[in-house]
A protein has these predicted regions:
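Glycine-rich beta-strand-to-loop/alpha-helix junction loops that act as flexible
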Residues: 15-17, 114
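Short, internal active-site loops enriched in acidic
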Residues: 103-109, 148, 167
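Short, histidine-centered active-site or binding-site loop motifs used for metal coordination
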Residues: 17, 58, 104-106
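Glycine- and acidic-rich phosphate- and metal-coordinating loops
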Residues: 84-108, 142
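C-terminal nucleotide
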Residues: 1-12, 19-25, 31-33, 37-89, ...
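Short, proline-centered helix/strand-breaking motifs
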Residues: 107, 288-291
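DPxDG-like acidic metal-binding loop motif
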Residues: 112-132, 136
């Protein structure tokens, strides 16, 4: 039996960071995001040779293990092992024999939610293979727990829900880990206009968001009012952007991104660097003068 799955990467359009605890647990978070036509891929091939073979092309990891109920988390293929260990444990299953192959259209650290999307993608493949009774909400929640709690990787909640639900979504993150996903019904002409108005620009550098997120958590826990007030405004930007998008107001959409970026830089050191700021300034302030 061979099972294939894919899950879409996402653009965080507004509210980014308000889905991270403890802020979301204290104040509640709001996120507006959209998935794009870049994906994480997973293939599982059931075998009978008593081996677990991992070909993780996204992390350049190629390993083989004897079939077991628990795979040691040692830095190699941690996302795959984390999903496997949790499923075997939660559903009290016997050790499995299989080959798993993963690939991602974007590099890790590109800011598109690659790791969380891969966890959802791997989960979806196991769900199909083992006929597990998990819907999109349950899959998202389980992916979050695997990545944040089991593996101890810092981050928020939006990426897992974006990958599982897909499309344009307005998400609410409430205390007690309650998440509500509100799909936006976008008119086709607005989506076309948005695509024509945006450029997805890769700086050429990948980086881990863990240090930035850890600083955001610290600022909230310590009561840093500058950072907290900035996050309040970032959260409000998700509300404002939802209205702008539904009306097709691209000028207001761009204005909200600019204002939110200024607030984002107040959240933690390392949010920006000279390369990122130069690119942002180029698209924000460069004007084309046509001959008259």
């Amino acid at each position: 039996m061979i099972v294939r799955s894919k899950a879409p990467l996402r653009l965080g359009l507004a509210g980014g960071g308000s889905d991270v605890s403890p802020y979301s647990n204290i104040y509640g978070g709001l996120i507006l995001n959209a998935t794009i036509n870049l994906y994480a891929y997973c293939t599982i091939e059931e075998t009978d040779n008593g081996q677990i073979v991992i070909d993780a092309f996204d992390s350049h990891c190629h390993k083989s293990y004897s079939s077991a109920k628990l795979l040691m988390i040692d830095g190699d293929a941690s996302l795959i092992k984390g999903v496997y260990n949790r499923i075997i444990h939660d559903y009290d299953l016997e050790a499995k024999s299989f080959k798993i192959t993963t690939y991602n259209d974007a590099p890790a650290g590109s800011g598109l939610g690659t790791s969380s999307t891969m966890v959802v993608c791997i989960l979806k493949a196991f769900i199909e293979w083992l006929s597990l009774p998990l819907g999109d909400y349950e899959t998202s929640r389980l992916a979050y727990e695997i990545e944040r709690k089991d593996l101890g990787l810092s981050g928020g909640k939006q990426d897992q829900y974006a990958a599982a639900f897909g499309g344009f979504n307005y998400m609410e993150f409430l205390p007690n880990d309650i998440v509500i996903v509100n799909p936006l019904k976008m008119k086709r002409w607005i989506v076309d206009e948005l695509e024509a108005s945006m450029v997805l620009y890769f700086t050429g550098a990948s980086r881990s968001s863990a240090a930035i997120i850890d600083e955001q958590k610290k600022n909230t826990s310590s009561g840093n009012q500058t950072a907290i007030e900035a996050m309040h405004r970032i959260k409000q930007s998700a509300v404002d952007m939802k209205l702008a998008l539904l009306k097709g107001d691209m000028a207001e959409f761009a204005h909200i991104i600019g204002q939110a970026w200024e607030d984002k830089k107040k959240m933690a050191n390392g949010i920006t660097n000279p390369t990122i700021q130069k690119a942002f300034d180029a698209v924000s302030y460069t004007h084309l003068t046509l001959p008259t």
